[in-house]
Swiss-Prot record:
Native source organism of the sequence: Homo sapiens
Modification sites for N-acetylalanine: 2
Covalent link (Glycyl lysine isopeptide (Lys-Gly) (interchain with G-Cter in SUMO1)) residue numbers: 66
Lineage: Eukaryota, Metazoa, Chordata, Craniata, Vertebrata
GO molecular function: amyloid-beta binding; protein-folding chaperone binding; unfolded protein binding
Role noted for this protein: Binds specifically to cytosolic chaperonin (c-CPN) and transfers target proteins to it. Binds to nascent polypeptide chain and promotes folding in an environment in which there are many competing pathways for nonnative proteins.
Name this protein carries in UniProt: Prefoldin subunit 6
Length: 129
């Protein structure tokens, strides 16, 4: 009985560890998006200071290419929308993973209690193996 519970417990621990890895990966991805959001907001603020007489360039590979100011503003705006949507998606994913992780933690606690009871019953019944 205890061996069966121990195997089940080990499987649940592995599931929990995988959830923690996924959670960590999602947090890391969200942090990268936050950094991109900050950078793009700075670019948006800088572009807002410019008028039509200013020349704007964008980097394409190793080459700087002239770009219309309106086009640059639109591109940055679209990028900000995309990044914001991705952050929301990551937040939803993080909530789901945290909920699953909490459920897994509860399952582990129950299995540990069962295992301890089985061990105690085994120790309390000499002659039985």
């Amino acid at each position: 009985m205890a061996e069966l519970i121990q195997k089940k417990l080990q499987g649940e621990v592995e599931k929990y560890q995988q959830l923690q890895k996924d959670l960590s990966k999602s947090m890391s991805g969200r942090q990268k998006l936050e950094a991109q959001l900050t950078e793009n907001n700075i670019v948006k603020e800088e572009l807002a200071l410019l008028d039509g007489s200013n020349v704007v360039f964008k980097l394409l590979g190793p080459v700087l290419v002239k770009q219309e100011l309106g086009e640059a503003r639109a591109t940055v705006g679209k990028r900000l929308d995309y990044i914001t949507a991705e952050i929301k998606r990551y937040e939803s994913q993080l909530r789901d993973l945290e909920r699953q992780s909490e459920q897994q933690r509860e399952t582990l606690a129950q299995l540990q209690q069962e295992f301890q009871r089985a061990q105690a019953a085994k120790a309390g019944a000499p002659g039985k193996a």
